[in-house]
Amino acid sequence: MTTQAPPSALLPLNPEQLARLQAATTDLSPTQLAWVSGYFWGMLNQQPGTLAATPAPVAEMPGITLISASQTGNARRVAEALRDDLLAAKLSVTLVNAGDYKFKQIANEKLLVVVASTQGEGEPPEEAVALRKFLFSKKAPKLDNTAFAVFGLGDTSYEFFCQAGKDFDSKLAELGGERLLDRVDADVEYQAAAQEWRARVVDVLKARAPSASAAQVAVAATGAVNDVHSSPYTKEAPLSASLAVNQKITGRDSEKDVRHIEIDLGDSGLRYQPGDALGVWYQNDPELVKEIVELVWLKGTEPVTVNGKVLPLAEALQWHFELTVNTANIVENYATLTRSESLLPLVGDKAQLQHYAATTPIVDMLRFSPAQLDADALVGLLRPLTPRLYSIASSQAEVESEVHITVGAVRYEIEGRARAGGASSFLADRVEEEGEVRVFIEHNDNFRLPANPETPVIMIGPGTGIAPFRAFMQQRAADEAPGKNWLFFGNPHFTEDFLYQVEWQRYVKEGVLSRIDLAWSRDQKEKIYVQDKLREQGAELWRWINDGAHIYVCGDANCMAKDVEQALLEVIAEFGGMDAEAADEFLSELRVERRYQRDVY
């Protein structure tokens, strides 16, 4: 249902808060809306006189501040579980997204807990960039009266494992904070470590934090991070959906194989918004499983135990273990286990282990350094299979019970043997139309269209980074939003790699897309990228920014996102008449105001 908002002057909510409230309630029935209204009214009135009290009692309560700094949802889930544990222990706790945290109040925190994931080359999640920058700036206050604990989430397949958590932990201590507990760095399989850490945090805080009344506990619970996204389908309990369309959208001679994938959600009622991601559980290639099994002189029928169930080895490898991403830990453990003459020299050398893992898939490590393993030893080396996240390329305002994604199939060769990405090749090659795909929605409130439909939008998305902007334009078209829209897109070749070309041309013709700037890096001698187009259009870009435009960036975190940010800083400095430091501060303010949002990976 659609509700006409009252004039902003009458609202106690800012436009972004109002947009989140409207998004949270858009699919509720009248009965559900009435229940929600009564629920909030009841919480507000659990104590006599609360109704007339001034707002924001949570901020004034003494107690624990719990900051969630999440990129893919894992840190958020850990933080929410800890919040529930603390509330169950009748402790006063406020849970807040790092992006919503007023970081200048950190000097007033007495008990602070941070749950932080890491992305890219050791960088914090997008929602925590401003907080980290503040803590590492000259403006950071002394924290002599603050006690803190940090839980870091990461992936040992990356060089800068849990770096964001390490950075928060070291800086909070450097500023004078007292560690409640030593930092925990958790790998992809983080659940057991998180459960143990949560129990320790609760025990420590029981002796430090004030107890909360029932009313305070209820009010504190409203500080949860986006609990409004309720669905019976989750990462742990995904929806079994049906693959409807698998269409190659790059040309015959393109070096890239990019697929437009449409998945039918049926009558599941699964809802998403532009900016959200689709989680996809995949199965490994049976041929890869067979190759690995044969390389260690096994048959695949050997029994192994996975999550308490006994399965044949081949089935376990296909459904439950990560086979396409190697890590330094796997290399080191395999070298130690097999006493491999070629791998043992790498043990203890972090840089060499990391390089070997990044350039040598597990199957080729087994081929180059062969050894006979029993089934339990093999699975003991491996990490659990985890779902892949894809930026959603559709809006339900247009596609209703479907969800679309844009998938770049990962393909390469090692010594003449074809290798492929686990999830991308599953979607591109191994799922037939109407075949089953297990999916869930990973909501991302840090990548949202402006609440005001008149606000201009600047979208920067080379390669498959174009995906969420297709969703944005579908939504803006359906809403008949009057705000201007400007797209920057790039890829190697115009004739082979112009993803969704006909759709963008239609949006331009219809006036939905006000401007489009294209960068083809291989169509001329000099390579041209989207960041070059940003500089080229600097004066007009600055005019849009001055008119209140929101800037969105999607795609590669390691190179593109950094190059684009540098170009934006140069444009701001040149056309805004600022020095480098002032331009950096200006862009940081845009981020805090949610006018500069990134979905990078």
Swiss-Prot record:
Protein name: Sulfite reductase [NADPH] flavoprotein alpha-component
Reaction catalyzed: hydrogen sulfide + 3 NADP(+) + 3 H2O = sulfite + 3 NADPH + 4 H(+)
Matches recorded under SUPFAM superfamilies: Ferredoxin reductase-like, C-terminal NADP-linked domain, Flavoproteins, Riboflavin synthase domain-like
One GO location term (cellular component): cytosol
Source species of the chain: Citrobacter koseri (strain ATCC BAA-895 / CDC 4225-83 / SGSC4696)
Signal peptide, first to last residue: none
GO biological process, one term: cysteine biosynthetic process
CDD domains in alphabetical order: SiR
Domain FAD-binding FR-type span(s) in chain numbering: 236-450
Positions of FMN binding: 70-75, 117-120, 153-162
Family, per entry: Belongs to the NADPH-dependent sulphite reductase flavoprotein subunit CysJ family.
Enzyme class of the recorded protein, top EC level: oxidoreductase
Pfam family, one: Flavodoxin_1
PROSITE patterns: FAD_FR (PS51384), FLAVODOXIN_LIKE (PS50902)
Pathways per UniProt: Sulfur metabolism; hydrogen sulfide biosynthesis; hydrogen sulfide from sulfite (NADPH route): step 1/1
Key words, A-Z: Amino-acid biosynthesis, Cysteine biosynthesis, Electron transport, FAD, Flavoprotein, FMN, NADP, Oxidoreductase, Transport
InterPro entries: CysJ, CysJ-like_FAD-binding, CysJ_Proteobact, FAD-bd_FR_type, Flavdoxin-like, Flavodoxin/NO_synth, Flavoprot_Pyr_Nucl_cyt_Rdtase, Flavoprotein-like_sf
